[in-house]
């Protein structure tokens, strides 16, 4: 029973695609942190990281009863997102984030999904979809659109360490996204364990030595 993650720019169609997969198959969706949890008035610099651990635990529980569990948004999101802003936001530098994940991984409180599916499209198409979607308000949309190239670069880098670990899906139509994802759901990768400390260290080293 695979645990997969859908990633991509805000507005590209991750949640819509995930919900369509759930309609067609026995799949459960773990929403992103901002949809699952109410943010406290005073937030520690590890609050968001701790919620990612909770998402992982939820996913492990749902894998007992569902054929597929979909992480709508990466549980390692603090790495990619903060890197795009040179680790100068949220009072979270690379060392803090890295040490948090090192500890959580060694304690089996968090791990890597079996495969990523990264949805992408050109910026104008993403902007049009956002304007046509009246169901959600997307805060800082233009700011997030501005980091798309760096964001994509990060997920490309994961394939340098684990070839074919991230499957890139050109997000033209939802039904095509679904077909592509379901067709590659059980394809193998070189990830031998979700708790790979070696893979984590490769990611941390790459982040430390590459600029967004």
Per-segment meaning from a language model:
Residues 1-3:
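Pre-Walker A (Motif I) flank of P-loop NTPase domains
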Residues 6:
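Hydrophobic anchor at the beta1->P-loop junction of P-loop NTPases
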Residues 9:
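P-loop (Walker A) phosphate-binding loop of NTP-binding proteins
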Residues 14:
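Conserved lysine of the Walker
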Residues 19-64:
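Conserved substrate/cofactor phosphate-moiety recognition/catalytic segment
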Residues 65-69:
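Loop/turn-to-beta-strand initiation segments
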Residues 81, 85-154:
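A glycine- and Lys/Arg-enriched "phosphate-lid" helix/loop adjacent to the NTP-binding pocket
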Residues 134-137, 142-212:
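NTP-dependent small-molecule kinase module
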């Amino acid at each position: 029973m695979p645990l997969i993650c859908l990633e991509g720019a805000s507005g590209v169609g991750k949640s819509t695609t995930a919900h369509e997969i759930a309609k067609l198959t026995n799949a459960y969706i773990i929403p992103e942190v901002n949809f699952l949890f109410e943010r406290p008035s005073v937030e520690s610099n590890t609050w968001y990281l701790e919620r990612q651990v909770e998402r992982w635990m939820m996913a492990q529980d749902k894998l007992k009863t569902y054929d597929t569990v979909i992480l709508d948004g990466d549980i390692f999101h603090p790495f990619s997102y903060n890197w795009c802003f040179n680790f100068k936001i949220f009072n979270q530098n690379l060392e803090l984030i890295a040490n948090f994940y090192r500890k959580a991984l060694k304690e089996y409180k968090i791990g890597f999904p079996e495969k990523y599916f990264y949805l992408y499209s050109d910026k104008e198409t993403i902007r049009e979809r956002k304007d046509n979607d009246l169901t959600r308000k997307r805060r800082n949309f233009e700011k997030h659109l501005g980091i798309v190239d760096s964001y994509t670069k990060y997920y490309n880098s994961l394939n340098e360490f684990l070839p074919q670990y991230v499957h890139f899906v050109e997000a033209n139509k939802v039904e095509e996204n679904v077909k592509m994802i379901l067709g590659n759901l059980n394809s193998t990768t070189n990830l031998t364990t979700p708790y790979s400390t070696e893979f984590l260290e490769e990611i941390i080293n790459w982040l430390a030595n590459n600029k967004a």
